[in-house]
């Protein structure tokens, strides 16, 4: 199954918002248009048996290819995404974005979303151009709440929206907006895993420099490492649960492979 197929089928999408959720199973990417009499050569899988029983003659559903997808993405540009054990988390996020837009075909649109706007209309048919086109001022810090608000205002209902980041700075009052997005769009959140999730490679008296600024001199021992491990796991669990409650499909962004991380959120082998 391809990533596009998974999106058309609403694969692994939560149904926490009931009837307000816009995206239901979209079959094989086709939409029903009308009924007509069956003729030899028609796809027998399209026979409508209820209509056949009512009319007494075989009736088949006429279907047309479903509307094109709009693939939108918000990617965290904050300084904390520029850290990692072997490479920056931002590189894995870029891989996930490439795979996301790589699922587009000729009639689909690709849209980057930022705090200042979205990809210009003229670039939305070109996945590569949409991926590279700036939507924010590089000198301005990443603003997650503003980016989510732009998505709500600018994207059409039913858009497939991907949000990739560590999301450390999402305030609790944003939960309502996340829920609105989850009801309006087919949303997927990839939560960047802390690079030192498995073990904090520090010991003794050390000086720490925060990715977002600030310095501290602390002692790191066995108890401190255990407390750190508990904290990063709890933070990741809480973020995944928070997005899931808001009707977002969720996954974990692993530093080693952004493509595989995106695919895992949909339960498929590779995002293609």
Cite the ranges covered by each PLM segment:
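Exposed, interaction-prone extracellular/peripheral surfaces
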Residues: 1-24, 37-42, 51, 60-272
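Short, Gly/Ser/Thr-enriched beta-strand-loop segments that form substrate-interacting elements
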Residues: 47-48
